[in-house]
């Protein structure tokens, strides 16, 4: 933590991961029955589009993002991220663990460039006691329709930011609370499962 949309609120990268890029578009999916969708489609339709696979009930909101100056971006090596995962696991997670055999795991998706696979495999074997599991994907500049993160240039960022700055969240009235708290139950009541 913070991860997902929580990291957007706090202005941080998502979890242990680096920022996606210096400039990028972050996409969020919302139900067409949600108050924010109604507001944006009426007032800022340039920020909203139908979700490609579920256009009847889901929309995608696109928001420009800029990493802080000097921030680590996803161009870092897989070994650099793995070392950060190990350090946080040793110094923070296991260092703060109080009782029981099971400790939490640092959730991470490691994207591996073609020339990194052998050394990453070796590192993972040699350091297997420092993680419970890792997601591993090939690094790719390939994008798919409405990807959660997509690189953009400064001009695109600036153009989208103009629209975003005019969004007035005070004008959104939520008559029904459609919040699904199931994802937060694991750490409810001050104790994580």
Residue ranges of model-derived segments:
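Short acidic, low-complexity intrinsically disordered linear motifs used
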Residues: 178-193
